[in-house]
Regions:
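Specific alpha-helical transmembrane segments that line the substrate/conduction pathway
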Residues: 9, 67-73, 80-128, 175-183, ...
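C-terminal appended segment following the main domain
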Residues: 226-281
Length: 281
């Protein structure tokens, strides 16, 4: 069950990245965050109403969920910005390095993954180094890379903590907190930029809502799948499988947008995928 859920999350998040890229480049990061987080929050509320599930009263679990929310907001803001200014086929694999952070934290907290998983974590780090090295047009290729790296650390810590939360709270209640915090942060950022008159202009109104609905649907499916997965399997394994979303994103970016990377960077992308696969063994 955990393997299936991890792969489903990977497929869904990989598709989400493409929708996010299209949306942020048409309405900017702030508007995209408000639109998508509001849609996701409404979806989560509908799921909770349908479930009739009573939330836990354990204050420690709620504090841990709040910590997850902080990491989620930080990782999301950094990743949205990376998608807006960077190359999709480059920043997405780097962002998927959150699996390394999760694996290391899980190991430190008592999980004992196989030796292949530890080797995969090391290989993945080497792949990130290769991808972030630019030998040609440095300004074009390195744009968004620092944001993607920061996002990987934030999401890695969040996914590790969710492994302790979802077995007691279920797959949906933690998402409510994450969405509320993400929407609050998005609205705050939007209002500041609006007051400073620094909002990005809307360039294509016709495709805003289809792209927003695409993000809401695929992102919600991915989150539910991940949370169900970590209830039945090691957090390290499910997170590593979910991080394969970057492979889906790169294939779509290569097929639809014809994004190009230097040969050494493609080598780094391949090494990242190898590391992710080893972590999941």
């Amino acid at each position: 069950m955990g393997i299936f859920c991890g792969l489903l999350a990977a497929l869904s998040w990989g598709t989400t990245d493409v929708f996010i890229m299209g949306l942020t480049r048409r309405v900017g990061t702030s508007r995209a965050l408000v639109y998508t987080q509001l849609g996701c929050l409404l979806t989560i509320c509908l799921l909770l109403l349908a479930q009739h599930q009573t939330p836990t009263s354990n204050p420690k679990l709620w504090l841990l969920v709040l910590g997850c929310g902080v990491c989620h907001v930080a990782g999301m803001l950094l990743m949205y910005r990376a998608f807006e200014i960077g190359s999709l086929a480059l920043v997405s694999p780097i962002g998927s390095g959150f699996a390394v952070v999760t694996a290391l934290l899980a190991l430190a907290s008592g999980e004992r993954p196989a030796a292949a998983a530890l080797l995969g974590a090391l290989i993945l780090c080497c792949g990130v180094v290769l991808v972030t090295r630019s030998h040609s047009d440095q300004k074009a290729t390195m744009a968004g890379v620092p944001h993607a790296i920061g996002s990987a650390f934030a999401f890695g810590a969040m996914f590790w903590a969710l492994g302790f939360v979802t077995p007691h709270m279920g797959p949906v209640w933690p998402l409510l907190v994450l969405r509320l915090m993400a929407l609050s942060s998005a609205v705050f950022t939007f209002l500041i930029q609006k007051r400073r008159n620094t909002l990005e202009p809307i360039t294509d109104k016709k495709r805003i809502w289809p792209l927003t609905l695409g993000v809401v649907a695929t992102d919600t499916i991915a989150w539910i799948a991940f949370n169900v997965g970590v209830r039945s399997d090691y957090t390290t394994i499910v997170t590593a499988l979910a991080s394969l979303y970057s492979a889906v994103t790169v294939v779509i970016a290569w097929g639809l947008f014809r994004e190009r990377l230097a040969p050494s960077q493609w080598t780094g992308v391949a090494v990242i995928f190898l590391g992710i696969l080893l972590v999941s063994i």
